[in-house]
Amino acid sequence: MSKTISILGATGSIGRQTLDVAEQLGLRVAALTANSNAERLEAQARKFRPRLAVLTDEAAAKDLAVRLADTDIRVLGGPEALLEAAVCPEADTVVTAVVGMVGLKPTLAAIREKKRIALANKETLVCAGQLVMDAADTYGAEIVPVDSEHSAIFQCLQGCADRREIKRLILTCSGGPFYGMTAEEVGKMTRADALRHPNWTMGPKITVDCATLMNKGLEVIEAMRLYRLPLEQVSVVIHRQSIVHSLVEYRDGAILAQLGTPDMRLPIRYAMTCPHRADNPSEPLDLLACPPLTFAQPDRDVFPCLRLAEEAACSWRRRSAFPTSPAW
C-alpha cells in the first residue's frame, strides 16, 4: 500500500480526486505539479504541505513562489521540473495525471527509480507503450492503471499468471452524450453538447474524447500495450449504465467483471492500496437499485474515431513484436 505520493497534474480532475483519496487514506504528499494554475496549486500545497510544488509555466511558477514564500515548500518552474517531482525520494507512488505526451519523460524517470506508477495518463502508453513496459520490466517498477476500464481489467486479471489463459479483454463504453444519434446529427453537436457526459465527471479534454469515442480508441491501444495482447483479443461494448467497468473472458468460458459506481475515486483508491483494500466512505453500489444492465455493439460509422484508433493499432502491430513469453 502506498504511504507517500507525488501527483503530476494535481489541479485537474484526477489530481483533485486523488487528493480526496489521499486525505481519506491518510497518505502523505511529497510533490504536487500543475501547468499554470497557481491559485489552485497554492491552496493544495497549503493544505497537504508537499516538499515540492511545480508549475510547468515558468511565469506562473514565479507567482506561486511568491504565494508560498511564507512556507518551507520548494517551488520549481518549467517542464523539466516535472522530472524532479517524479523522482522525489520521499514518494513511493507517482500518480501521472497530466494530459498528453508530457507525461512520458516523468513516467520513465519514476520507473527508473522503481516507483509504483498510478497511471492516469493514457497517452504515455499510446505513444510509447513498448518502451514504458520494457522499462518497467527492466527496473522492476509496478504500473497500476487508474483508468476505470483498465483498473477493472487489472483487478479481473489478479491470479492469472499466464496470458494464454485469456480469450479477450472487453472494454465497456458508455457511448457518451451522442449515443443513438446518426452521423448527421452528431455533426451538428457543439462543444457544450460534447461536455455533457451522462455518467462521469471528468476534465474537458477526456469528456470531449468520450463523446467521439476517441477516448475508447486510445483505451484499446492502451490495453494492448499494458496487457501485451493483440487487437484481436481486445473488444469494445456499449454499456450505457457505466456500472460494469470492464470484463475479462477466459479460454474456459468464464467471464470476470468488475462492478461499481461511476466514481473515479474507486480506481484511484485501488491504485493506492492494491493488492489490499481499504474502507470507502462513498456510497457503495446498490445492486437492488441498479437499472437493467445492457450491452451493445458500437457503431463505427457514426463514431469513426474508434475505427481509426483500431486501424492505427493494427499498423503498430505490424511494426512491433509482442513478447514471446506467456508470463506477465
Regions found by a protein language model. Give the residues of each.
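Catalytic, metal-anchored helix/loop core of enzyme active sites in primary metabolism
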Residues: M1-W328
